[in-house]
Amino acid sequence: MMDYPIVFVPGLFGSLGDDVIKGTGDFSFGFAEKIYRPFIEILNSMGYTENINLFISYYDWKKSVLESVDKYLFPDVEKVKQRTGTDKVILIGHSLGGLLGRAYMNYFNPITVDKLIMIGTPNLGTVNAYYFWSGGKVPYSKLEDDILYNGLKIGFILYYYIFKKIKIV
């Protein structure tokens, strides 16, 4: 188990509540429950417990990224730190939630984040991210000649082989 609590930020359509659609009640995963619940259960199996050291930062995905961070993620991180008595959190963001995590790091309070983990986050925009998701090939070859691209590619391959050997108990 990690030393810091996890704050998970779901992706587009991953939050449902009165702030998103009036009359739907308190925040939850809503229709995305079947998508996110298995991930939460994996974190539970690693020793994380919801509302103890695992928290969900729901938000109104119709708002801009910065507005969502300001209204939802930033206050949630502050509440988690106060509740757990820690000075840092681990942010895990899926898809649009990863963009909120990145905005938090860039414009809010990065010193309070031990790690930012982005899963399926469209950092290059949704169209470019789709090519990786659908088959791993970029539609133009100039990118493959780029030094930064090749460095990231090698880094991901090394990351995969290193963490593939680590067993999670």
Please report, for each region that a protein language model flagged, where it lies by residue.
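Alpha/beta-hydrolase-fold enzymes
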Residues: 141-169
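N-terminal non-catalytic accessory region
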Residues: 1-149
